[in-house]
UniProtKB/Swiss-Prot annotation:
The keyword RNA-binding applies. GO terms for cellular component: cytoplasm; ribonucleoprotein complex; ribosome. This is Large ribosomal subunit protein bL21. This protein binds to 23S rRNA in the presence of protein L20. The keyword Nucleotide-binding does not apply. Keywords: Ribonucleoprotein, Ribosomal protein, RNA-binding, rRNA-binding. GO terms for biological process: translation. It comes from Buchnera aphidicola subsp. Acyrthosiphon pisum (strain APS) (Acyrthosiphon pisum symbiotic bacterium). Part of the 50S ribosomal subunit. Contacts protein L20. It comes from the Bacteria. InterPro entries: bL21-like (IPR028909), bL21-like_sf (IPR036164), Ribosomal_bL21 (IPR001787), Ribosomal_bL21_CS (IPR018258). One of its GO terms (molecular function) is rRNA binding. Belongs to the bacterial ribosomal protein bL21 family.
Length: 108
């Protein structure tokens, strides 16, 4: 069984007990959060596709870790003009473990 949901403007496909890396969430470590913007629920017997979201469907997850990724460098330059601009960026992330996937009737 798996589900597809939206978090931080991106779509993620998850199964139970999977650890995924999401965009930064403003919740403390060790808390349980619930995602309700579920696009699709899939079980070996049935598929539920939302319009746009599956009503009553939730995904419960446990926050494992907060952090930052490696620095990426952005370099912009013009040739023959002696112009160069450098910038770096480190993206924040949150690691989450999927605890449970529920539909409106209970488990899918």
């Amino acid at each position: 069984m798996y589900a597809v949901f939206i978090s931080g403007g991106k779509q993620y496909r998850v199964v139970k007990n999977q650890i995924i890396r999401l965009e930064k969430l403003n919740s403390p470590l060790g808390t349980t959060i619930e995602f309700d913007k579920i696009l699709m629920l899939f079980d070996k017997d049935s598929i539920k596709i939302g319009t746009p979201f599956v009503e009553g469907g939730t995904i419960k997850a446990h926050i494992q870790n907060h952090g930052r990724l490696k620095k990426i460098k952005i370099i912009k330059f013009n040739r023959r003009k002696h112009y160069k601009k450098q910038q770096g960026h480190r993206q924040y992330f949150t690691d989450v473990k999927i605890i449970d996937i529920n539909s409106i009737k209970g488990e899918v």
